[in-house]
A protein has these predicted regions:
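Phosphate-ester processing/binding pockets and catalytic centers
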Residues: 2-282
Length: 282
């Protein structure tokens, strides 16, 4: 099995805590299986080049072509699609709850821009620091992959594009977001790791997950047309291999007296996000 991963809107955290982020995970038998369906579903431009969800001035027409192709071949689609979504404000909560559960290995620091960072101790000599909301996204990404492994029973190779804030690698300090997610997966003894594309063929394998990710994220953020919402519902109802859902891991926080303070901390974090208008794009 090989699963291609795509995210919208990459990993940039917006000031709106109600803005949705979506991961699309499309699982195929092998590379040839992916390429067969890319040729069947994904539109091309006038030069015969495959077009991405957000590409070009004619992106609405291209999107409609992809969506209509999915409806046309709904009964033939034999790969899994799992589109997982959560709000930016909920990711802030995930970051803080994860911090409070793991304070022996995580500390808080201000970076040179004055942002509050979470610093994760990887080894005695090595640590990785991320702004809180980016940390929340990466931790949620880890939990989403864990869900795919534990609940959906998806195994094999997971192929991801570089995360938006990652510096291209290989090398020390490169692709830190992907490396951090892999670290969390390894610590959980999950037999899955994210792989990054190493050649042009691999870079082009995410075309279907790119479209499903954009499609579902537009539905979550209420920017999709009524027709496109109905078509995704039709697709997922007619083909059980296609699923779209909102997923927030159930994390609990217990204080030193053994009291569950999860609801109290969640309320404070979400209210703080709304008041402060957290924005970590820069």
């Amino acid at each position: 099995m090989i699963t291609t991963l795509d995210t919208q809107p990459q990993e940039w955290m917006e000031s709106n805590p109600n803005a949705f982020h979506t991961i699309a995970a499309c699982t195929f038998d092998n590379i040839e299986h992916i390429e067969y369906w890319i040729n069947k579903l994904v539109p091309k431009n006038r030069n015969g080049e495959f077009v991405k969800w957000s590409s070009g001035k004619r992106n609405v027409r291209y999107r409609d072509i992809f969506i209509n192709n999915c409806i046309k071949y709904v009964n033939e689609i034999d790969f899994y699609v799992n589109c997982i979504s959560a709000k930016a404000g909920e990711m802030s909560w995930i970051a803080w709850s994860f911090y409070m559960q793991n304070q022996n290995h995580i500390r808080q620091e201000k970076d040179r821009k004055g942002r509050n960072n979470l610093v994760f101790q990887i080894t005695e000599e090595k640590s990785i620091a991320f702004p809180v909301l980016r940390a929340g996204f990466l931790i949620w990404y880890y939990y989403a992959l864990k869900y795919l492994s534990d609940v959906k029973k998806i195994k094999g190779k997971f192929l991801s594009d570089y995360f938006a804030s990652d510096e291209l690698g290989p090398g020390e300090g490169k692709a830190l977001g992907a490396a951090f997610v892999n670290f969390l997966l390894k610590q959980s003894n999950l037999d899955i790791q994210i792989s990054l594309p190493t050649n042009e063929r691999f870079k082009n394998l995410d075309r279907i997950s790119d479209y499903f990710c954009g499609w579902v994220n537009s539905i979550r953020n209420l920017s999709a047309t009524k027709e496109n919402i109905e078509k995704f519902d039709l697709l997922s109802n007619k083909n059980p291999m296609i699923d779209g859902f909102i997923y927030i891991p159930l994390l609990t926080i217990i204080d030193e007296n053994g009291t569950d303070i999860t609801s109290e901390i969640m309320r404070k974090v979400i209210e703080g996000s709304k008041i402060n208008g957290e924005n970590e794009q820069n």
